[in-house]
């Protein structure tokens, strides 16, 4: 294992421990990845507990989502990761989490997007410099056909290239960043904002 791969794999392992510890990636849910180079990514293998990841639980794939390591099966949602790397070469890490807040809020919001507005913490997202604007988070209906789901995500990415993430209804969050630390920061910001939105909804009823 070369130094770069070892470092990126350790970042994925550390991310899993952090996200599991916060309750945002329970049991074997979720999947994480990091860009290895222009043609390859490292992803968590299918069905592994994210708080207990080891070096053997991460594999290399091409950007079409195909495993480059015989005997290792990538997550069923690998294509949603590699789609992002192929779309934007500046993306270096992608995190998919399954928190209670993201799951519940995605089911409560009517329509195809969640609008975050007037929160100071919006500035935690890459490219956002003020609380005064809106951050639109698309919500896609869950689909076991990942290629079909990816085909619905792609037009949004093209139309809104500064979008910091998206939700899958009743499922979870996808967010990304130039580095793993950036993606983790965005997960944490999203989770704070999701909790705020849920509190607002509960108090307004």
Curated annotation (Swiss-Prot):
Zn(2+) binds at residues 96, 98. One of its GO terms (cellular component) is cytoplasm. It comes from Pseudomonas aeruginosa (strain LESB58). GO terms for biological process: L-methionine salvage from methylthioadenosine; monosaccharide metabolic process. One of its GO terms (molecular function) is methylthioribulose 1-phosphate dehydratase activity. Belongs to the aldolase class II family. MtnB subfamily. Its cofactor is Zn(2+). It catalyses: 5-(methylsulfanyl)-D-ribulose 1-phosphate = 5-methylsulfanyl-2,3-dioxopentyl phosphate + H2O. Gene3D superfamilies: Class II aldolase/adducin N-terminal domain. Keywords: Amino-acid biosynthesis, Lyase, Metal-binding, Methionine biosynthesis, Zinc. Binds 1 zinc ion per subunit. Pathway: Amino-acid biosynthesis; L-methionine biosynthesis via salvage pathway; L-methionine from S-methyl-5-thio-alpha-D-ribose 1-phosphate: step 2/6. This is Methylthioribulose-1-phosphate dehydratase. Catalyzes the dehydration of methylthioribulose-1-phosphate (MTRu-1-P) into 2,3-diketo-5-methylthiopentyl-1-phosphate (DK-MTP-1-P). Its EC number is 4.2.1.109.
């Amino acid at each position: 294992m070369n130094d770069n791969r070892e470092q990126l794999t350790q970042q994925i392992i550390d991310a899993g421990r952090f996200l599991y510890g916060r309750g945002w990636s329970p049991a074997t849910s979720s999947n994480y990845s990091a860009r290895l180079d222009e043609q390859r990514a490292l992803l968590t293998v299918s069905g592994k507990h994210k708080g207990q990841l080891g070096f053997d639980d991460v594999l290399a794939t091409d950007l079409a989502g195909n495993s480059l390591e015989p005997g290792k099966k990538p997550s069923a949602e690998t294509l949603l990761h590699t789609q992002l790397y192929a779309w934007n070469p500046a993306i270096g890490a992608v995190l998919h989490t399954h928190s209670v807040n993201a799951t519940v809020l995605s089911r409560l919001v009517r329509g195809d997007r969640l609008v975050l507005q007037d929160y100071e913490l919006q500035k935690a997202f890459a490219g956002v410099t003020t609380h005064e604007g809106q951050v639109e988070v698309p919500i896609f209906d869950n689909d076991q056909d990942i290629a079909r789901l990816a085909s619905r995500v792609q037009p949004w990415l093209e139309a809104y290239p500064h979008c910091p993430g998206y939700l899958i209804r009743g499922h979870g969050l996808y967010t990304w960043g130039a580095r793993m630390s950036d993606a983790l920061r965005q997960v944490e910001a999203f989770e704070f904002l999701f909790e705020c939105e849920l509190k607002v909804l509960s108090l307004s009823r």
